[in-house]
UniProtKB/Swiss-Prot annotation:
It comes from Rattus norvegicus (Rat). The active site is at residue 174. Belongs to the GPI inositol-deacylase family. Its main location: endoplasmic reticulum. Keywords: Endoplasmic reticulum, Glycoprotein, Hydrolase, Membrane, Protein transport, Transmembrane, Transmembrane helix, Transport. The keyword Transport applies. This is GPI inositol-deacylase. InterPro entries: AB_hydrolase_fold, PGAP1-ab_dom-like, PGAP1/BST1, PGAP1_TMD. The gene is Pgap1. Its EC number is 3.1.-.-. It is an enzyme of class 3 (hydrolase).
């Protein structure tokens, strides 16, 4: 079989492909920053109080429950309903637990205690029985309807309040966020029941793995509704992504569609969230202390003091979310901040006329105002920059309109500042403030603390450096370099030509300082202007720091902004910035964005080899080895040109109309293009990875069959080769009917798995029989040749009364090896619904809806027949020529329609298997 035909050159090539795939996988699973999230803690024992729901509802949804989270005395007090707080509903995601509400619920409780329960939140959580809704979409609609009922039940718990809530805030983790968005698609749902939606690591754009049509249809329904009704949706929505640490849901999938007439949606990556600044994995995003603190601060700022509920003002909600999640000015949120501030009191005023100034404050007894006159600076400089290491929330920088060196009132410029991990900074373009005569920096009286304030004026051209990124195919052999050799505090490096997801670079920043000064901190901020996916790197100077540079979201076609590396530097230091292409990270981007399509490319390669075997059986009468046919037939030029040509023709109106007229689905390549995910050579890379996977899976299946046959011979009496090759054995119809009944009454995937095991059993039995036959043959080569001649002599008569020879058995095993490979991928792609069914067996004996049932009804009879099929019985079939021609177009179809819709892949496998089985009868 396959093990005896391993070609060393091919083996070396496939080993090399494994090496490349490993580089990409390493970048996805390990090529990110360490987990910097702090663990959130409880200070009292957590309690989850089950909320009694109507019996009718419990009977309709026996697997689902609703809980109220509490701790200590709060939990005891709220066992007696009704409630008095602000309702927040937590929706867990794929395989998520209702207990994941603990972290944010505990932090909210501590915050309420700090303000003596002037306001407090009641956190509810839904128990979805940890269903695998990311893999099986049949229960998503059911979950959505249950959440609707939960919202109505929650609001009933607040009857009797002075200001009873009329809506709830929802926090949805993973698929829970999608379920929350789906609420709006329900016929009887009132949009006013939700006042705020926060989603964490929710794939909004498309499913991570579209393994059944129900999940794809659910996504289509939700996204189409939100796009078509964007003008009428007034729900403030925040989507938070985990960044590169979250390899389960890539951040690009979490970005809500940005529509010009729907401005109440924000999407941000945790690495860009102020006071968080870390990347989170898919689970830690629900307990990461930095992120949960930011979320709770925002929730408390959203409270309306009059109603003691979350505000109904959309503008305020969006302002609060921008304040806490997008740009924090290092000040407490104010709905209507006072722009004009009084600069009075017993304070010292100090004029500063230099263009670069630094002040170290330590145990200051007096308040000091440092005034920078702008008249002369406007003639020379374009911008002013100030920073302070004092991270309090007081106003610290103002603008004076008076022409004198002192002013009683000033424009509070602190609201324009930006909070960073170690400083708060402000950059002003002077021409935007023509009425200002002075910039005033306020230094308060401090005792026992030390901080530094720096200000400088500069020309934009002197602080902006253009650095084109290196070419994709430089493979890190060439680099681009920029040297910053000055005493400035702030620089912008414009990263030209960066905008595609397939680009990935390694940026090295080396800092050197003159003199023996103490270690100081520099901040390097990667700013992506077309999406909130910024990331920060903090470095001690002097140092050498590597920064990973790659994108979550590609630059839109109509966007002309340039990605920036903002450098908050130290004076009297030199910075050398080197950028070069990172080939492992490019492979990582391929895996990250397209790894889910790999099964389609694997099946496409196997189908090409399968077609080659059928053709060799037709033309030569012998079936060649799977590995040989894979090397010969699995070529990307047999597939990719057709997909590219179809995509090109679909650009013409007449072809698109013809395409739609025959009801063909949308080409997957067009879907990827709409998501800015198509890039050069990706299909070629995936095809090579797919062929490599097909090769190793063939090697594994062949080795498994031989191992199982050896165990068979060790445990049972040696078998013999069958004396005839009848396809229809007496037990075959009965077995087929049993499997079909199992499929109808329980789960289609279970029936497919059982029929697959039956097929493997038949192949193992044949392998054991062949091994026994060979072991019993005499060693004399002359006798072997006579036997071979005798076998060939009876070849024609074998057609009339076929008998299975050793050569025929080997041919059959070669064909069976390929069929096992195809069936293995069908079983793997159907396993999620089987796992879902088995987990919910105590609630539902029959899976409904069942995505695999139609597949099972076609596949089971074909597998049953193929289990008894031998090559000798189909060599003379009139249908063999047709069967050998089908795999090639189907291999193209798998890539064209199955790479983004994996549930379609088994459909392309069934067709050649059915024709193969029919060859026994025609």
């Amino acid at each position: 079989m396959f093990l005896h035909s391993v070609n060393l050159w091919n083996l070396a090539f496939y080993v090399f492909m494994v090496f490349l795939a490993t580089l990409g996988l390493w970048d996805v699973f390990f090529g990110f920053e360490e987990n910097k999230c702090s663990m959130s803690y409880m200070f009292e024992y957590p309690e989850y109080q089950k909320i009694e729901l109507p019996k009718k509802l419990t009977k309709r949804y026996p697997a689902y429950e609703l809980y109220l989270y509490g701790e200590g005395s709060y939990a005891e007090e709220h066992k007696i309903l009704p409630l008095t707080g602000i309702p927040v509903l937590f929706l867990p995601g794929n395989a998520g637990s209702y207990k994941q509400v603990r972290s944010i619920g505990s932090i909210a409780l501590r915050k309420a205690e700090d303000i003596d329960f002037k306001y407090h939140f009641d956190f509810f959580s839904v128990n979805f029985n940890e269903e695998l809704v990311a893999l099986y979409g049949g229960s998503l609609q059911k979950q959505t309807k249950f959440v609707h009922e939960c919202i109505k039940a929650i609001l009933k718990l607040y009857k009797g309040q002075e200001f009873p809530p009329t809506s709830v805030a929802i926090i949805g983790h993973s698929m829970g966020g999608l379920v929350a968005r789906a609420l709006l698609t329900l016929k009887n749902f009132k949009q006013d029941l939700i006042n705020l939606l926060v989603t964490q690591a929710t794939p909004h754009v498309a499913p991570v793995m579209p393994l059944d049509r129900f999940i794809t249809e659910f996504y289509m329904t939700v996204n189409n509704y939100w796009i078509l009704n964007a003008r009428h949706i007034n729900l403030t929505t925040l989507s938070v992504a985990g960044g590169f640490r979250d390899y389960q849901v890539r951040s690009g999938l979490t970005f809500l569609p940005t529509l010009s007439h729907h401005t109440s949606a924000l999407s941000v990556v945790t690495s860009a969230v102020p006071k968080t600044w870390v990347s989170t994995d898919h689970l830690s995003i629900v307990w990461c202390k930095q992120l949960q603190l930011t979320t709770i601060r925002a929730f408390f700022d959203l409270i309306d003091a009059d109603t003691k509920q979350i505000t109904q003002k959309s503008k305020k909600k969006l302002s609060v979310l921008n304040h806490h999640f997008i740009r924090h000015p290092a000040k407490q949120f104010e709905e209507n901040p006072s722009i004009i501030s009084d600069l009075t009191g017993t304070s010292m005023w100090v004029p500063v006329k230099v263009s670069r100034w630094s002040y170290v404050a330590y145990n200051e007894s007096d308040k000091i105002y440092f005034a920078f006159p702008l008249a002369n600076h406007r003639k020379v400089y374009t911008h002013a920059y100030c920073q302070s290491t004092m991270l309090d929330t007081n106003s610290w920088i103002f603008g004076c309109i008076n022409s004198t060196s002192m002013c009683r009132q000033g424009v509070d410029l602190s609201w324009k500042a930006e909070l960073l991990p170690t400083i708060k900074s402000l950059t002003l373009r002077l021409q935007d403030y023509p009425s200002l005569s002075h910039i005033v920096v306020y230094v308060p009286s401090v005792h026992g603390s030390k901080f530094v304030v720096d200000c400088e004026f500069f020309k934009k051209e002197a602080r902006s450096i253009q650095l084109p990124v290196t070419h994709l195919f430089s493979f890190g052999l060439s680099s681009r370099k920029a040297i910053i050799n000055t005493s400035g505090r702030y620089y912008n490096i414009e990263l030209l030509n960066l905008g595609q997801i397939y680009q990935a670079f390694k940026v090295n920043v080396v800092s050197k300082c003159t003199g023996g000064k103490e270690e100081i901190t520099s901040i390097y901020k990667l700013h992506i202007p077309w999406s909130y996916e910024d990331s920060l790197t903090i470095a001690q100077v002097p140092s050498s720091v590597d920064i990973s540079l790659k994108l979550h979201v590609a630059q839109p076609e109509n966007d002309s902004h340039v990605a920036l590396l903002k450098m908050y530097t130290s004076s009297d230091c030199q910075y050398e910035v080197t950028i070069k292409t990172s080939f492992p990270q490019i492979l990582g981007q391929v895996v990250r964005f397209h790894g889910g399509a790999l099964p389609a490319y694997v099946v496409s390669s196997i189908l090409l080899a399968y077609g080659g075997q059928l053709y060799s059986l037709l033309s030569t009468g012998f079936c060649l080895e799977y590995g040989t046919m894979l090397d010969k037939e699995a070529k990307p030029y047999k597939v990719d040109p057709f997909v590219i040509m179809i995509k090109f023709l679909l650009g013409y109106k007449w072809f698109k109309e013809l395409w739609d007229a025959v009801l063909l689905p949308e080409l997957d390549a067009i879907v990827l293009t709409s998501q800015s995910m198509c890039f050069p050579l990706v299909s070629l890379i995936l095809f090579l990875f797919g062929t490599c996977t097909a090769y190793w899976s063939g090697l594994l299946s062949s080795a498994s069959v031989q191992l199982l046959s050896s165990l068979w011979l060790a445990l049972k009496r040696p078998a013999e080769l069958p004396k005839d090759v009848k396809v229809m054995s007496p037990d075959l119809p009965v077995l087929t009917v049993v499997f079909l009944i199992i499929s109808w009454t329980t789960c289609g995937a279970l029936a497919i798995l059982l029929s697959y095991l039956y097929y493997v059993f038949k192949v193992v039995h044949l392998q054991a029989s062949l091994t026994t036959f060979k072991n019993n043959q005499p060693v004399n080569p002359k006798h072997s040749r006579r036997s071979e001649k005798k076998s060939n002599h009876h070849k024609d008569s074998a057609i009339q009364n076929p008998r299975l020879s050793a050569n025929d058995a080997e041919d059959s095993l070669r064909m069976h090896s390929t069929v096992i490979n195809l069936l293995t991928w069908v079983v793997l792609l159907s396993m999620p619904s089987l796992i879902y069914w088995s987990k919910n067996l105590r609630y539902y004996f029959k899976l409904n809806p069942d995505p695999c049932k139609p597949l099972a009804f076609l596949l089971i009879p074909a597998i049953a027949v193929l289990g008894n099929t031998h090559t000798v019985s189909i060599k003379s079939s009139k249908l063999l020529k047709t069967a050998s021609q089908f795999p090639l177009p189907l291999a193209v179809g798998v890539i064209a329609f199955g790479s983004s819709h994996l549930y379609r892949v088994p459909c392309f496998v069934i067709i050649p298997l059915v024709f193969h089985s029919l060859c026994n009868f025609m």
